[in-house]
């Protein structure tokens, strides 16, 4: 059951005529206001006497009129609401003012053996006796059936109005029989029992407007029930249709990969370079028009398409960074954990990624190539020195035949000084000097000249013996 609330302005020190005029509110129009000309004592403000709701107006005792001291009026402004009590033995509010208002608005079934209505004199006598004792009393309204609380309420020009015109209200019972001091008040067995709690306004920001829209012949609680049973702003069929359409759109995007391209297509670094795998063995082609990549597996194509779409489904749990490939995420996590499973075979240095180790290994290979290049010139120089004696020994015979006469004429003096024999000394020492000159010009190093001096001299000595007759004839 929903709650209905209303604003009421009550003056607890002026209640001589409690039903003369109620303040108008959106839901309680034309109800009498608690207003009177006589005042209570400030000690009697904490407890109110019991009053009856008969067809006649309750007359207060004349002793209240003797008070001439007028206390400042206290105004209580609050918001009261109605809700059904969970059981018939629920307690009222501890303040007598709330008890009075709950008695005015609350409803309860009365048994068939309820007491008859009391006269005005008995009401005034009971109220005087109650005010002299000043006990906290409660008041209640009993009816035979549950009817609309706020039905079409007419104005009350006379002093004995009917609060609920749809049914005949029963008066209050006598204080000695029906009035039970608080706490707890005992209610008769009833079908429905209500009490008036005090609920702040901010809990129901739209409730007052909803109650004001309810017609006079309709229960406000029924209106609240209807409001809670209204369908949502978006029908369920519309939500299902939207969800179906969204799923279809996602399938279309996943099948074509062209409707939602976030990043422009990236050109290949070497577009004309042929792939190792033939095209007929790579059936999965990239659907982007400007990309001619083909793949042999579907997962490779899916991973490649993430480059075009910008999708990064793999997220690091530590730094919340996203990656498009799972292996990138794995290597990234190693930066947090410090794991380095790849070690260099040469120097033992460890790396977190295999490509880093591969790049590091190339450094060692380049160093080996440089060392090999430095060792190559030394190995080439040694065969030249070993080959030169054979060259000198292979050319002794043509030299004396071709250059014998000019050399002898050019260099006569050193030959005579070196060799005493005139015939042999004239020709062959000159050949020796000529051959030495050629060797010096060809090999400027002093080591080469020293290495060739001894074989040439030995060769000339042999040649002098062999060709001595011929040389004599030429001379």
Curated annotation (Swiss-Prot):
Region listing for Disordered, in residue ranges: 109-180, 264-285, 355-379
Matches recorded under PROSITE patterns: ZINC_FINGER_C2H2_1 (PS00028), ZINC_FINGER_C2H2_2 (PS50157)
TM regions (residue ranges): none
Biological process annotations from GO: circadian regulation of gene expression; positive regulation of DNA-templated transcription; positive regulation of transcription by RNA polymerase II; regulation of DNA-templated transcription; regulation of transcription by RNA polymerase II
Keyword terms: Activator, Biological rhythms, Cytoplasm, DNA-binding, Metal-binding, Nucleus, Repeat, Transcription, Transcription regulation, Zinc, Zinc-finger
Zn-finger segments (C2H2-type): 284-308, 314-336, 342-364
Keyword GTP-binding recorded: no
Function: Transcriptional regulator. Recognizes and binds to the DNA sequence 5'-GCG(T/G)GGGCG-3'(EGR-site) in the promoter region of target genes. Binds double-stranded target DNA, irrespective of the cytosine methylation status. Regulates the transcription of numerous target genes, and thereby plays an important role in regulating the response to growth factors, DNA damage, and ischemia. Plays a role in the regulation of cell survival, proliferation and cell death. Mediates responses to ischemia and hypoxia; regulates the expression of proteins that are involved in inflammatory processes.
Protein name as it appears in the record: Early growth response protein 1-B
Source species: Xenopus laevis (African clawed frog)
Gene name, Swiss-Prot/TrEMBL: egr1-b
């Amino acid at each position: 059951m929903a709650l209905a609330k209303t604003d009421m302005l009550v003056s607890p020190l002026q209640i001589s005529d409690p039903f003369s005029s109620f303040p108008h509110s959106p839901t309680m129009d034309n109800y009498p206001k608690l207003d009177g000309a006589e005042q209570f004592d400030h000690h009697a403000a904490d407890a109110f006497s019991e009053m009856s709701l008969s067809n006649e107006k309750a007359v207060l005792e004349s002793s209240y009129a003797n008070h001439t001291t007028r206390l400042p009026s206290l105004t209580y402004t609050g918001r009261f609401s109605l809700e059904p009590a969970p059981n018939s033995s629920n307690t009222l509010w501890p303040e007598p003012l709330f008890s009075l208002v709950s008695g005015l608005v609350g409803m309860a079934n009365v048994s068939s053996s309820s007491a008859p209505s009391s006269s005005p004199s008995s009401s005034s006598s009971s109220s005087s006796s109650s005010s002299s004792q000043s006990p906290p009393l409660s008041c209640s309204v009993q009816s035979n059936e549950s009817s609309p609380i706020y039905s079409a309420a007419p104005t009350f020009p006379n002093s004995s109005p009917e609060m609920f015109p749809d049914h005949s209200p029963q008066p209050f019972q006598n204080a000695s029989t029906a009035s039970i001091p608080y706490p707890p008040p005992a209610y008769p067995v009833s079908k429905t029992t209500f009490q008036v709690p005090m609920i702040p306004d901010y809990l129901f920001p739209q409730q007052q407007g909803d109650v004001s829209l309810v017609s006079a012949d309709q229960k406000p609680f029924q209106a609240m029930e209807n409001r809670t049973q209204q369908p949502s702003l978006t029908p369920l069929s519309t939500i299902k249709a939207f969800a179906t359409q969204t799923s279809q759109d996602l399938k279309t995007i996943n099948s074509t990969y062209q409707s939602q391209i976030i990043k422009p297509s990236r050109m290949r670094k070497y577009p004309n370079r042929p792939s190792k795998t033939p095209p007929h063995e790579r059936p999965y082609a990239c659907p982007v028009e400007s990309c001619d990549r083909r793949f042999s597996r579907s997962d490779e194509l899916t991973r490649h398409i993430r480059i075009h779409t910008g999708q990064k489904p793999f997220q690091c749990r530590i730094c919340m960074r996203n990656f498009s490939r799972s292996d990138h995420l794995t290597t990234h996590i190693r930066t947090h954990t410090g794991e380095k499973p790849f070690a260099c075979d040469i120097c033992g240095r460890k790396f977190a990624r295999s490509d880093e180790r591969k790049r590091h290994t190339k450094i060692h290979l380049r160093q080996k190539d440089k060392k090999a290049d430095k060792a190559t010139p030394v190995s080439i120089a040694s065969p030249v020195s070993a080959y030169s004696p054979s060259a000198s020994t292979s050319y002794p015979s043509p030299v004396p035949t071709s250059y014998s006469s000019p050399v002898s004429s050019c260099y006569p003096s050193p030959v005579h000084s070196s060799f005493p024999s005139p015939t042999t000394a004239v020709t062959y020492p000159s050949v020796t000097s000529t051959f030495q000159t050629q060797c010096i010009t060809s090999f400027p190093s002093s080591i080469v000249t020293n290495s060739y001096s001894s074989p040439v001299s030995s060769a000339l000595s042999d040649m002098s013996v062999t060709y001595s007759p011929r040389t004599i004839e030429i001379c």
